[in-house]
Amino acid sequence: MDKLVVNGAKELSGSVEISGAKNAVLPLMAATLLTEGEHTINRVPDLKDTRTFLNLLEMLGAKSTYNNGDLLVDSSTINSVEAPYDLVKTMRASFYVMGPLLGRFGEARVSLPGGCAWGPRPVDYHLKGFEKLGAEIILEKGYIIARAKKLKGAQIHFDIPSVGATANILMASVLAEGKTQITNAAIEPHIVQLCKVLNEMGAHIEGVGSNILFVNGVEKLSPMKVETIPDMIEAGTFLIAGATLGNITLKKVDPTHLNIVIRKLEQAGCELVVNDNSITVNKCDKLQPVDMTTDVHPGFPTDLQAQWVALMSVANGSSHITDTIYHDRFAHVPELIRLGADISLNKNMALIRGPKKLKGAQVMSTDIRAS
């Protein structure tokens, strides 16, 4: 069994360069399927998910080289439109290939996705969007098959902003005939980057950065050359860690992606120095409790909820943490209690009573954020 041994009560100091964002690079990798040619993506993090997605692109026929964060993908040799179960089951983001395959080839065959176990993350928004664009959707032997002679622009509305569906519908609609309007679209930084990159490739997307996107379909795109934006979740994790015991500087970061996290840390009594592409956080001598509710961007990210719960367990007072995105995402709470935290759960809300002196113990990791 894999394990990490942590010797605690050590002050953190120094600087760290933030990696490229996994959540940004995966849809960019999918977008290489939209057109033939050699695509260049820099600052690609070397992670299991990026390696898995690269394997998927190669199974579809793409050729690639990956070296020290630089990825080259030649999508001129795509010879399959099927994303097999063995790969898709390990990573929900594999579903991103459906939009570009459908847009470029008029057909996609993708296994129902797998991924993290907590909370429902249906692909209904994706499929309903494809249908509005004119695709026929069939479920057959665990595979979703989408076909269309030519996608046509449509008005598409999401009841709840969906990052995955927004990205998928964008990639399908840039090659559709006519105009597509997407309302209540996700506005996360990686969606903004995807829009900008698609426009640089020759797409016509208006309203970038807002929750209403207008896409005028084009006949052909050019290959991309892009550097992935910094990972706001990695950066936020280091900021929260630095607030406990330390003085650390984050480099190659975009502070505008972390406005809500910076504000919450300042409310907790932390001193931060924010520059154009760096953030320094000093430990909080008297950490104050701060309530937090997760929300879609620009709200507090659900991917930083577990880290904030851990921080608040040593704050001087009680705080309430509510997760409105994934109501069951509290597997870390029983493990923090094993360390000495005083936390009680009520549905999707955690009541944390601090301060508690946490002590080392054996704990179990159930998912990446709980770790």
Residue ranges and their predicted role:
Residues 1-371:
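Short, structured segments at the rim of ligand-binding sites
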